[in-house]
C-alpha cells in the first residue's frame, strides 16, 4: 500500500482506538462544516463474461436523475482493506474447513490488500489490525476459540462504521466479510415471537413466527442505507426451518442493500468455494467517489454507466443511499 494512503488511516490503530472511535461516531453531533463538496462512495462491478477493464471504461453517474461528477475512481488493482469478522460458535467440522479456506485466500491476496480480523462474540473485538503482514491475521484465525452466542446482528453496524471511517480517511477500497454459522435460536435476544394467547387460534403470532426477525432486519436495513462499505456474508450452515430461513433471507437482504453478497453453504464441501467467490468478488470491485449535486435530498437513487468506445458495459452497482453529512476524518 502506498505510504501516502497508509499515513492517512494508520492513526486508527491499534484496535482499541478504533473501537473507541465507533462509540464516538454513534453519538449524536452537529454536522461538520467542510469546504469540499459532499460525496458518496459507490461500489461497482463489471458484470460481463469477458469484461472490459474498468481502467478502460468511461464511467458516468446520475443521482436522482441529475448528472453527478465522479471525483475519483479506485479500480480492482487499487488498495484494498478487508475486514474479516468471525462469528463462529457451532460445528467444528464446518469451522475448520472455513478457517483453512480463509487463510488460503488471505495468503493469496496481492501486496496492496491489507486484512484485519475481528470477532463478533460479546461485542466487536479486534484480533488483528489491518496489516500487509499476513501472519497476525493467520494467527488470529488459527487460534480462534469457537464458543458463545452469534453476534452478527449486534456488531454489523459497528463493523460497517469502521469501514466508513477508513474510506473517509484514505482513498482505499474497503470491504467487510462476515464468516458466520449463526442459528437464529442461539442469539441472546429472543427472536422466536412466542404465541401471545395460546387459547386463541387466530393469534397472529401463530401465523407469523418470523415477524421479530423481519422487523429487526428492516431496522438494520435502514441503518445500513447511510453506510457505504459493501458487506459480504459467508454462512457455513444453511438451515431449513421457517425461522432460520427468515433469518438467512434477512442476511441476504442486508448484503444486497450494500451491493455486497451473501452465500449459504449446504454442506462442508461448499464452504471453500463460497469463501473463494467472496474474495474474488471483493478483489474485482471498483469504488467511485461521486460528488452530490447541490440540491441532493436525503434519499439518493444512483445510476452508474460505463462505456468503452461506443459499447456500454454491463455493470452492477449500489443504487440506494440515505445520505447524512459526515466528517471526512477525525
Question: Can you say where each PLM-predicted feature lies in the sequence?
Answer:
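Von Willebrand factor
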Residues: 75-129, 135-180, 184-186, 207, 234, ...
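Second-shell loop/turn segments in exported
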Residues: 85-93, 104-105, 122-128, 140-149, ...
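Bacterial N-terminal signal peptides that target proteins for export
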Residues: 2-14
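VWA/integrin I-like adhesion module and closely mimicked acidic/polar interface patches used
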Residues: 182-253
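Von Willebrand factor A/integrin I-like adhesion domains
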Residues: 230-283
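C-terminal "exit" segments of structured domains
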Residues: 33-40, 267-330
